[in-house]
């Protein structure tokens, strides 16, 4: 498991922005991760993932997962948001039996080491959106719609990971920090629900989510050091 390490994401209390005073670190050397296995299906067609993460574009490795949902039945059935070097990916291997898979790769690249806000939003079985710092990523390579398939996320018995996994592919993370993780079951939310553009600095800042925490598997993990790691605060 990781440990809570005090960090600050762009502190600027004078602007009235939410200040995040904690994060959870994941380092490859110890292969840490958080794991949850749903006991029942949530909404597999509509959900929102939102979190802040510290990214180093010089990080090595094929894929470094922020989030991953996996099938225990087939080694190559998994879905998750990850990055390799300076590029963000969302990969969904739908079926090992059929060989079908989906890959979204952003053409925009991480230039600087720093905190970024990420969102993955499944609107329905034919619409999926990626956001970085409030901006939808519409310039994508190898992008394919998910052909009406339900998600690995929110499926009873399929493990949901943060920061790494025990998956057969062996993917592990190297993120110096992750904070303010939300998984909202059954809602396709917008960046404005979690952040805003600061008029004084023209930068994307975190905002406290004030919406509803509906759904079977919804959770909120602040990683602020004020509650046990992995304990849902929704």
Residue ranges: model-predicted function:
Residues 2-4, 10-189, 200-230:
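Extracellular glycan-associated modules
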Residues 196-198:
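Low-complexity Ser/Thr/Gly/Asn-rich repetitive segments
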Residues 233-234:
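Phosphoinositide system proteins, centered on phosphoinositide phosphatases
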């Amino acid at each position: 498991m990781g440990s809570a390490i005090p960090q600050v994401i762009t502190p600027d209390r004078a602007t009235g922005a939410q200040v995040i005073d904690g994060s959870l670190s994941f380092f490859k050397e110890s292969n840490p991760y958080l794991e949850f296995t749903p006991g029942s299906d949530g909404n597999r067609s509509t959900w929102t993932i939102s979190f802040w993460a510290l990214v180093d574009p010089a990080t090595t490795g094929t894929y470094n997962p922020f989030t991953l949902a996996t099938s225990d039945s087939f080694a190559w059935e998994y879905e998750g948001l990850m990055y390799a070097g300076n590029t963000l990916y969302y990969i969904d291997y739908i079926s090992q039996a059929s060989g079908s898979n989906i890959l979204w790769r952003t053409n925009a690249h991480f230039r600087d080491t720093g905190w970024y806000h990420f969102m993955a939003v499944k609107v329905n079985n034919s619409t999926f959106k990626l956001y970085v710092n409030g901006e939808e990523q519409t310039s994508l390579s190898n992008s394919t719609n998910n052909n009406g398939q339900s998600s690995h996320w929110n499926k009873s018995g399929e493990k949901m990971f943060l920061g790494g996994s025990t998956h057969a592919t062996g993917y592990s993370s190297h993120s110096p920090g992750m904070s303010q993780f939300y998984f909202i079951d059954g809602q396709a939310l917008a960046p404005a629900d979690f952040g805003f553009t600061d008029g004084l600095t023209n930068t994307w800042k975190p905002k406290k989510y004030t919406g509803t925490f509906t759904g079977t598997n919804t959770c909120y993990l602040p990683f602020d050091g004020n509650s046990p790691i992995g304990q849902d605060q929704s």
